[in-house]
């Protein structure tokens, strides 16, 4: 659920949705990327002038300024049946997926190739 919980509770979008919020450090840009089984869309809110920003993360975070636009957009997309965007679940992979997660292996390889970047003891 995380920062996108309002998609379910406030906007009543109960189908399977993956999403990611983002915010710049000075709250001048916020975005939300939403992924459904048959549509991927993103919303960015910001200004070209970097001095334009919200005073706090509570107001200027992607979950507060971009997610509401995305959720309202998706409500309208789902309401317009002529678009053919359904509220289906994600398709389960036919076979189990495996992903190697051995960060130490890659860190050692990077240290060999980039000795000047890594300093021992840090």
Regions found by a protein language model. Name each.
Residues 1-106, 119:
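A penicillin-recognizing enzyme superfamily signal
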Residues 111-122:
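Short, low-complexity, Pro/Ser/Thr/Gly-rich segments in the mature regions of secreted, periplasmic
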């Amino acid at each position: 659920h995380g920062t996108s919980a309002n998609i379910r509770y406030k906007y009543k979008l109960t189908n399977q949705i993956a999403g990611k919020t983002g915010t710049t450090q000075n709250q001048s840009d916020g975005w939300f990327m939403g992924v459904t089984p048959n549509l991927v869309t993103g919303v960015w809110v910001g200004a070209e002038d970097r001095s334009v920003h919200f005073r706090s993360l509570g107001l200027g975070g992607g979950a507060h300024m971009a997610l509401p636009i995305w959720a309202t957009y998706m409500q309208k997309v789902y309401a317009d049946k002529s678009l053919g965007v359904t509220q289906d679940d994600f398709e389960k992979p036919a076979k189990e997926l495996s992903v190697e997660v051995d960060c130490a292996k890659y860190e050692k390889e990077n240290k060999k190739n980039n000795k000047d970047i890594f300093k021992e003891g840090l």
